[in-house]
Amino acid sequence: MLGTLYLCATPIGNLGDMTPRVVETLQTVDVIAAEDTRNSIKLLNHFDIHTPMTSYHEYNKVEKAHQLVGQLLNGQNIALITDAGTPAISDPGEVLVRMCQEQNVPVTSLPGPAACITALTLSGLSTRRFCFEGFLPADKKEKKAILEDLKTESRTMILYEAPHHLIRTLEELYAALGERRITLCRELTKKFETVFPTTLEKALDYYKTEEPRGEYVLVVEGKSPEEKRQEEIASWESMSIEEHMAYYEEQGMDNKSAMKQVAKDRGVGKREIYQYLHGNS
């Protein structure tokens, strides 16, 4: 009989957020796979949990995932926990989940705290559509590519950042996105929880005199529809109307449809485009 992998969300700060279901599961599984056993032992001791632990982290994720899947195939039940929050969100848990799926090992999630969602709900920014970026990569080329993608992102963006990198990241976001609203959250659910709604420019000014402390969740406003529309219009206006027509005709549009789309792009009537083209023909 196959074992089950339990993804157990743990508190991101306030121990009162630990659910009874997670406590019971951690007490009854055969093994707990933890991102940092030294950190997790404090949590387990607090809840009188004495289940054996093993480490599962970024630097052993592939080798250890194979080992854990082997134990699951032999019928052991395993709980996966991260240092704080929900496993597989910005941590190596996804590798283990994927391997379990490949071997048809049951996986279930015990939902609970997640810093990204907690910050989003506190941000005051749009929650209708959002994207999670986690930590920006250290590699400069990779980071540049992601920031380039985010320039046109219309959804609310959620990022994580360490205090010693915060100012640099704010500078990079400001350079890429321009002035945007941002909410900076730190110490979430703890005694000194801070939620700071501001703008990128004002945040940079603020942290020139205030030292960043604690882990941050950054919630950044996406590009507004009006801003995107103005950029599109500027882009189309850099083309001649003939070039604009050719662009759509090369994509397979007939002349009438292309004319209609060109008029829409430029915010003018179709008749105006028609008269221009025939006046210049």
Where on the chain are the PLM-derived regions?
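Glycine-rich, flexible N-terminal cofactor/catalytic loop recognition
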Residues: 1-57
